[in-house]
Structures are given as structure tokens and as C-alpha cells.
């Protein structure tokens, strides 16, 4: 029985109402425990955190760290790997490449080095679930899970057309059990299927009809959201709206929020969906965050993560095939596209965000507007949609921008003049507190994901803890934690990996109507390239540990 205490730290634990109070944190067998009643009880180790900031471990609820498109991007970017830092093997760590799409081991070391202990890949094709789990075995130090793509799934659309919501619900339950996934993701609902069937097609709005299936994106969003709530999944439908990146797409985003009809919905990388303007004229590009944020503020069924853009080179990777092709045409560089049988697609294109570009500068500003205009920090999560808007390594820079309006003004002064007239960021004076930073990077994502054992330092929580050295340089504070603990063990000390542990795979196992299995099997064996018996992950295939997260009371 291993017992440890973090003594006299300045604790930020918003889930338990602790805002900068000096407290001791007791840990035993990987969990937070109450302080012993006997004052003479001695722990095996004492960490003196006097003068230091103590928070729960960070949670990235939307990133891309595994799966086929991540691996395709790794192969596409040898030039990026060559000019980026190489992580050399040590007695504890494996070697790896970095850059915008780091290798598996490097990804985990870099995340943990920032104080993050949990991460979710946001878009895994069900067919690729087995390989994603195998990649997770090479991603130590983190607990991890993934969201399963279903917004262009042909079985789902077939049953929506047939007005068989009970089969949609049963299929999603079966799919999550088969893949050991965590949540349901919809990417450009219906649009990817149109792209696959027409070659260069897409949908332009929520009421366009998807070829051959005679359903609309609105019906897909509504049907999936209802099924997710009926299955009582811990995380709501995770929505990548139609028309990502297009001028004027804010109206599509607003209609998507309305299409949920009161069901829970998480709108992801919302920055990319908040643009004013004419789709045929980029000169009209601007922000419509105030209108969208007002709607989110008044509808408690909605949460968002931002997808912040930061300047520099990165890589766009998405389950949105037509978007990948659009970026290729705009940027003129490398491009990769792939169709995933009856399930999904993807597109990849390297991109460099430039300060001198009005569009890129506005994207940077629009992301910050979302953080500053959503009234309740519990309903907005930090993300860069790694690596789409920027690497997750940019999080300390973003935190510094949110906590210091002078710093924001200094960056604005370096951007094209027109930025100031096409967004409201110059007028926003709000500055985040450390408590609010703890919410959007830890407690809030945990609540959105339904992870009751993470994101806080209360009794029974996982003992995932980050200890920071406070100072005037906020960016420096968050990019180099003093200590990072995972399940009560010190993994990182001043940026150096001291111990490697595997972490756990997080997934759900919802109940579903097994009477639907014959229908699923019949359709599957008529259309797929693999047999249905080879599709589900079997329990014995898991070489690492896994945690089944229970459903919600919603």
C-alpha cells in the first residue's frame, strides 16, 4: 500500500470549489484519499509543494494522435520530421520524431511534459479501431480513448431513410462495443458520402439530400444525437459541422445547433465553423462568433471546443474528404485522400498559418473570441484540433493569451489592419484566471466527457496531478511543469521523463437491443470486405489495461 502526500500546494480544483487555497493532497494506490484522521500517520513520500501551483492532470478531449490518417500524415511529412527535434532513446524512453505529427512515443512524452495525462483521438474509422488500439499500446504515460466515425455510415443512413430509429440506436451500441470506442462522431454529416459517390461532390447545407440514401444532414444529426442520448453515453454526439472553413458557414453551424432539437451536442473545433462572408469571395471573410456564442450561452445542451489556430507550419488532417481537397486546391501542396468503405473518408494537406494572411489572422482572432465570449468556462474546452489549428504544444501560448489582454493586443498589432474591423477581439478585455484555465483544460473536458474520476482532486479521483512553478511568464509556467504524476507516480520532473507507465484505454460498453444483430450481420456481410466475425475487438486482444466508463443519467 503506497501512500504519498503533496504538502502545502496552492490548489486549483474547480470541480470541488477549490480556487487557489493551500492544501495537502493525499494519494494512496493511485487514487486521491482523505487526509488520515491520525495526525501521526506517515506517508512513504512527501512532495513539498510550498509556493507551487497544483492542478489535476490535463485532458485533451479533441486531438488526432492515432489511426490511419495520422499515419498517412506521418508518411507524407519526412521534411517536417527532418527539421524538427528528434527524441533520442534513453534508459526509460523510446526514440521518436516530432514536428506537427509526432510519432506515437514522442506524442505521449510531449503531452505528459506539458502536464497532460489523458487524451482522446477524435476521429477513428470503425474498420481501423483495432490498429488504433495497437497504436495506443505505443502511446504510454496517457490514458486515452477515441471517438468512432458514424456521420456518413451507410447502415445508419439506410435506417434513417427507413425511419427505423431503434435500429440506428442498436447499431451504434453494437458499434461501440465492437470497436471499444468512447463516443460517436459525425464529420460533415452526409457530405463525405456525397464526396465518395460523386467524386467531387459535397453538401452545401443541412437540407441537401444525400445521393442514394435520400436523407439530409439535418436528419443525420438529429437521428444520431437522439440515439446517443437514448444509449445514455457519457459524451454527447461530437459534431464536426458541414461547410468547415467556408466563408459564411456560421449559418450552417447555427442550424446544426438547432437541428439537435434539445439533445446534447458537442460542437468541435468551433473556430473553423464561425465565419461570416460569401463562400465565393474570401475578401468578405470575417467573424460571427458573437451570434453563435450568444446561442451557446442560452442553450445548456451545447458544449464546444475551440480548435485554436496559431501561426506556423502544421498539417490539416480530417475525416472530411472534400475539405482536404479544397485545401489542396487553395494551397497547391501535397494532398492525400482516402475512402473508408461504408463508413467514412479522410483528407490530409500540410498548411502554414501566416501572420500576413488576413484569413489566417482572423482565424487566430476568432478562436480567442470563442474563449472570451462563452460566459461559462465549463462549456468551452481548450483545443487546437491537434494538429489542424496548431500542435498541442501551443497550449501554453494560448493560456498566456487568455490570461493577458496586453499580450493579445501586442499580437494584434502585428497582424493585417483589416483584422480589427472584421472581429470583436480588440474590444474584449476579459482575462482568464488560473481557476478558469483549470476548468477549460481539466475539469471542463472531464465533465463534458462524463469522466467522473478525472479532472479533479476530490476523494476517489485518479491521482493524476500536475505541479507548476508560478511566475510572471505564464507561457513558461505551463510549458515546463515542475512535476507530473500519473496514478500517484511521478512520471515527469522538470521536463524529464523519470518513469514510463502504459496508461489505460477508456471506452464504453452500452447496452443495446441484440435483436438487431441479424440485420446488422446481413448488411455487413453483403457490403464489407471483412467478415462480421472478424470485425469486433475481442477482450483477449487487449494487451494493456482498459477502463469501461459508465453511462450518464441523462
State the predicted function of each range:
Residues 38-55:
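Active-site metal-binding motif and surrounding structural segment of the metallo-beta-lactamase
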Residues 55-61, 121-122, 269, 305-307, ...:
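Active-site neighborhood of phospho(di)ester-bond hydrolases with catalytic His/Asp-centered motifs
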Residues 66, 127-129, 153-156, 191-195, ...:
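Flexible loop/turn segments at secondary-structure boundaries
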Residues 77-97, 199-211, 324-349, 404-422:
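A solvent-exposed, charged loop/short amphipathic helix patch at secondary-structure junctions
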Residues 164-188, 192-380:
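Histidine/acidic residue-rich metal-binding segments in metalloenzymes
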Residues 53, 59-209, 545-546, 550:
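Divalent-metal coordination cores built from histidine and acidic residues
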Residues 1-41, 67, 74-75, 81-118, ...:
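Active-site microenvironment of metallo-dependent hydrolases
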Residues 143-151, 258-269, 406:
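Acidic, His- and aromatic-enriched active-site or binding-groove loops in soluble protein domains
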Amino acid at each position: 500500500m503506497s501512500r504519498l502526500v503533496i504538502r502545502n500546494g496552492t490548489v486549483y480544483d474547480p470541480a470541488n470549489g477549490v480556487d487557489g487555497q493551500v492544501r495537502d493532497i493525499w494519494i494512496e494506490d493511485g487514487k486521491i484519499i482523505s487526509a488520515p484522521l491520525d495526525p501521526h500517520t506517515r506517508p512513504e513520500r512527501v512532495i513539498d509543494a510550498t509556493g507551487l501551483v497544483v492542478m489535476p492532470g490535463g485532458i485533451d478531449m479533441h486531438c488526432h494522435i492515432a489511426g490511419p490518417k495520422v499515419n498517412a500524415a506521418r508518411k507524407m511529412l519526412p521534411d517536417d520530421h527532418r527539421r524538427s527535434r528528434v527524441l533520442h532513446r534513453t534508459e526509460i524512453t523510446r526514440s521518436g520524431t516530432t514536428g506537427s505529427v509526432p510519432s506515437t512515443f514522442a506524442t505521449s512524452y510531449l503531452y505528459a511534459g506539458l502536464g497532460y495525462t489523458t487524451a482522446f483521438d477524435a476521429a477513428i474509422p470503425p474498420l481501423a479501431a483495432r490498429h488504433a488500439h495497437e497504436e495506443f499500446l505505443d502511446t504510454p504515460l496517457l490514458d486515452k480513448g477515441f471517438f468512432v466515425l458514424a456521420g456518413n455510415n451507410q447502415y445508419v443512413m439506410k435506417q434513417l431513410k427507413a425511419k427505423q430509429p431503434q435500429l440506428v440506436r442498436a447499431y451504434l451500441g453494437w458499434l461501440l462495443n465492437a470497436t471499444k470506442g468512447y463516443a460517436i462522431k459525425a464529420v460533415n454529416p452526409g457530405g463525405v458520402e456525397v464526396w465518395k459517390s460523386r467524386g467531387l461532390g459535397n453538401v452545401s447545407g443541412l437540407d441537401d439530400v444525400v445521393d442514394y440514401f435520400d436523407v439530409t444532414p439535418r436528419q443525420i444529426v438529429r437521428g444520431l444525437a437522439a440515439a446517443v442520448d437514448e444509449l445514455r453515453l457519457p459524451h454527447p454526439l461530437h459534431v464536426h459541422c458541414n461547410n468547415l472553413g467556408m466563408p459564411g458557414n456560421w449559418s450552417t453551424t447555427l442550424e446544426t445547433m438547432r437541428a439537435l432539437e434539445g439533445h446534447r451536442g458537442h460542437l468541435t473545433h468551433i473556430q473553423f465553423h464561425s465565419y461570416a462572408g460569401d463562400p465565393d469571395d474570401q475578401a468578405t471573410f470575417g467573424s460571427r462568433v458573437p451570434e453563435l456564442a450568444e446561442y451557446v450561452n442560452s442553450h445548456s445542451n451545447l458544449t464546444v471546443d475551440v480548435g485554436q489556430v496559431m501561426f506556423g507550419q502544421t498539417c490539416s488532417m480530417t475525416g472530411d474528404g472534400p475539405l482536404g481537397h479544397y485545401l489542396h486546391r487553395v494551397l497547391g501542396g501535397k494532398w492525400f485522400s482516402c475512402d473508408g468503405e461504408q463508413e467514412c473518408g479522410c483528407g490530409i494537406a500540410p498548411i502554414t498559418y501566416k501572420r500576413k494572411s488576413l484569413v489566417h489572422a482572423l482565424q487566430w482572432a476568432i478562436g480567442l473570441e470563442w474563449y472570451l465570449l462563452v460566459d461559462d468556462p465549463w462549456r468551452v474546452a481548450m483545443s487546437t484540433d491537434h494538429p489542424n489549428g496548431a500542435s498541442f504544444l501551443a497550449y501554453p501560448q494560448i493560456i498566456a493569451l487568455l490570461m493577458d489582454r496586453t499580450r493579445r493586443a501586442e499580437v494584434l498589432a502585428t497582424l493585417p489592419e483589416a483584422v480589427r474591423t472584421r472581429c470583436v477581439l480588440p474590444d474584449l478585455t476579459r482575462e482568464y484566471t488560473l481557476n478558469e484555465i483549470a476548468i477549460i483544460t481539466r475539469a471542463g473536458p472531464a465533465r463534458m466527457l462524463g469522466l467522473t474520476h478525472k479532472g479533479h482532486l476530490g476523494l476517489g479521483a485518479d491521482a493524476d496531478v500536475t505541479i507548476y512553478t508560478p511566475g510572471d511568464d505564464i507561457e513558461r509556467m505551463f510549458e515546463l511543469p515542475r512535476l507530473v504524476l500519473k496514478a500517484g507516480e511521478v512520471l515527469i520532473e522538470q521536463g524529464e521523463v523519470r518513469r514510463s507507465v502504459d496508461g489505460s484505454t477508456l471506452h464504453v460498453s452500452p447496452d443495446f437491443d441484440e435483436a438487431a444483430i441479424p440485420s446488422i450481420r446481413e448488411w455487413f456481410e453483403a457490403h464489407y470486405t471483412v467478415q462480421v466475425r472478424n470485425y469486433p475487438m475481442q477482450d483477449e486482444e487487449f494487451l494493456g489495461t482498459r477502463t469501461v466508463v459508465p453511462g450518464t443519467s441523462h
